[in-house]
Curated annotation (Swiss-Prot):
Predominant location category: cytoplasm
Gene3D superfamilies reported for this sequence: GroEL, GroEL-like equatorial domain, TCP-1-like chaperonin intermediate domain
GO MF: ATP binding; ATP-dependent protein folding chaperone; isomerase activity; unfolded protein binding
Gene name as annotated: groEL
HAMAP family in the record: CH60
GO-annotated cellular components: cytoplasm
EC number(s) given by UniProt: 5.6.1.7
Binding site for ATP: 30-33, 51, 87-91, 415, 480-482, 496
Family: Belongs to the chaperonin (HSP60) family.
Protein name: Chaperonin GroEL
Location(s), subcellular: Cytoplasm
Keyword Metal-binding applies: no
Length: 552
């Protein structure tokens, strides 16, 4: 076992603080409409230009292991916020840095770290409750477009296209983002379906950036039973390999040698393949498989109707223009099914809804109807170069996550104003001792940081703006960093999803609180560098021969 190095007490806090400072300083320059870009070097290809906080955070590794631990913990804040809300990663990083910096000052002054953490937690609970009170529902297309615009770094064209996509396929509808072929963004609504089943093995992934399996113009095999014996599949796989097209297998389950063979074929490039479990259970699974069959122009291979897997031919398979399979769901885009058949199937489901007496059955049938009739909106991102395309695509995906979060939990005034407005709720927080009161004050000071950083990135004096916003009576009053004007943030279209602000605050307080209460850090001792001339030892032996000469 390798030797370890330990640090204790204030040494720990200082080391973590240095690491957090490096990471947060790199991330926070991107905050707000006038935030700057960060260029990330890649081991191959062109560098990536981004204004996305989590993308910057993920690239940072520090040489000093103690400092790196601090940086990695704040990286976790950004990643968790991105996973939970899809946006707000820079805000979360700024909040975490602020809580840690203020917290370390208090700990070094002799206060109890555990009580400080309890005070911070109480303040965050009160602030989140107040955030929910000032939140407004986000229902109309205009508000959705505004949220998308803000999240896409004030790019109105992105906000508008997301709002249009949501209007066409519904707020719960499936929206995917693809590379476009022109300079402008384009929206296309195609026949499609998404269901909540992901790939059966991570070895099917072929897009490492999105961690997804993407198949262009694939065959789709639908099987209403478990597949475990590979012999049943071999004749069909051989025919598909000859055609050169990829394959998506949807079955009750795929296990054992059948799954292993599909994985091996995929890795070797014999057949590009992905396998997923069929959605639903029992009779509902059979019905959903039939829906997919109608959508893709295929047949469900089922012994109930006299079709066996060994005898299946390419004519029994469905197909689609594109299929995207992630860890959690599968999206079939532009299936090759006959429009008349799809229409008849939709009518059949509508009749079933009318005749059903069970609310649960009606809800499930309604879901099937939405999947079959709703279609999939595809946003095609246009750009002049590949570097711009990557950056723009990331912004569209961020904006899409933010608008979904806004629809889910509503919106609050943006630009860091919401966190300023909830500060008054901290006045009534009950504390047990002076150290907890200081914890509440740490959270209070930290919540003003995002507004100050947004203003700082515009080059204006942050203290003046923060004071003016804080002392104004109107909840929505704030500073528009893009234009330099004061006014009603909601009317100016500067909105943040409540979920994004809430998640950023909770995650930042959670990790920063843990860091403040850390008393010891343990890491591996750095390996000693070997001497530059390993042959030197042998040369030393030659001197001994000289001694022997003296004996003669």
């Amino acid at each position: 076992m390798a030797a370890k190095v330990l640090k204790f007490s204030h040494e720990v806090l200082h080391a973590m603080s240095r690491g957090v400072e490096v990471l947060a300083n790199a991330v926070k320059v991107t905050l707000g409409p006038k935030g700057r870009n960060v260029v990330l070097d890649k081991s191959f290809g062109a560098p990536t230009i981004t204004k996305d906080g989590v993308s910057v955070a993920k690239e940072i590794e520090l040489e000093d292991k103690f400092e790196n631990m601090g940086a990695q913990m704040v990286k976790e804040v950004a990643s968790r916020t991105s996973d939970d809300a899809g946006d707000g990663t820079t805000t979360a990083t700024v909040l975490a840095q602020a809580i840690l910096v203020e917290g370390i000052k208090a700990v070094i002054a002799g206060m109890n770290p555990m009580d400080l953490k309890r005070g911070i937690d109480k303040a965050v609970t009160a602030a989140v409750a107040e955030l929910k009170k000032i939140s407004k529902p986000c229902k109309d297309q205009k508000a959705i477009a505004q949220v998308g615009t803000i999240s896409a770094n004030s790019d109105k064209s992105i906000g508008d296209i997301i709002a249009e996509a949501m209007e066409k396929v519904g707020k719960e509808g499936v929206i995917t983002v693809e590379d476009g072929s022109g300079l402008e963004n384009a929206l296309e609504v195609v026949e499609g379906m998404q269901f909540d089943r992901g790939y059966l093995s991570p070895y099917f992934i072929n897009n490492q950036q999105n961690m997804s399996a993407e198949l262009e113009n694939p065959f789709i095999l639908l099987v209403d039973k478990k597949i475990s014996n590979i012999r049943e599949l071999i004749p069909l796989l051989e025919n598909i390999a000859k055609s050169g097209r990829p394959l998506l297998v949807i079955a009750e389950d795929i296990e054992g040698e059948a799954l292993a063979t599909l994985v091996v074929n995929n890795i070797r490039g014999v057949v590009k393949v992905a396998a997923v479990k069929a959605p639903g259970f029992g009779d509902r699974r059979k019905a959903m498989l039939q829906d997919i069959a109608v959508l893709t122009g295929g047949k469900v291979i089922s012994e109930e109707v006299g079709l066996s897997l060994e005898a299946a031919s390419l004519d029994d398979l469905g197909s689609a223009k594109r299929v995207v399979v992630t860890k959690d769901d599968t999206t079939i885009i532009d299936g090759s099914g006959d429009a008349g058949d799809i229409k008849n199937r939709v009518e059949q489901i509508r009749k079933e809804i009318e005749n059903s007496s069970s609310d649960y059955d009606k809800e499930k049938l309604q879901e099937r109807l939405a999947k079959l009739a709703g279609g999939v909106a595809v946003i095609k991102v246009g750009a002049a170069t590949e570097v711009e395309m990557k950056e723009k695509k990331a912004r569209v995906e961020d904006a899409l996550h933010a608008t979904r979060a806004a629809v889910e939990e509503g919106v609050v005034p943006g630009g860091g104003v919401a966190l300023i407005r909830v500060l008054k709720s901290l006045d009534s927080v009950e504390v047990e001792n002076e150290d907890q009161r200081v914890g509440v004050e740490i959270a209070r000071r930290a919540m003003a940081y995002p507004l100050s950083q947004i203003v700082k990135n515009t080059g204006v004096q942050a203290a003046v703006v923060a004071d003016k916003v804080l002392n104004h009576k109107d909840v929505n009053y704030g500073y528009n960093a893009a234009t330099g004007e004061y006014g009603d943030m909601i009317e100016m279209g500067i909105l943040d999803p409540t979920k994004v602000t809430r998640t950023a605050l909770q995650n930042a307080a959670s990790i920063a609180g843990l860091m403040i209460t850390t008393e010891c850090m343990v890491t591996e001792a750095p390996k000693k560098k070997e001497e530059s001339m390993p042959g030197g030892g042998d040369m030393g032996g030659m001197g001994g021969m000289g001694g022997m000469g003296g004996m003669m």
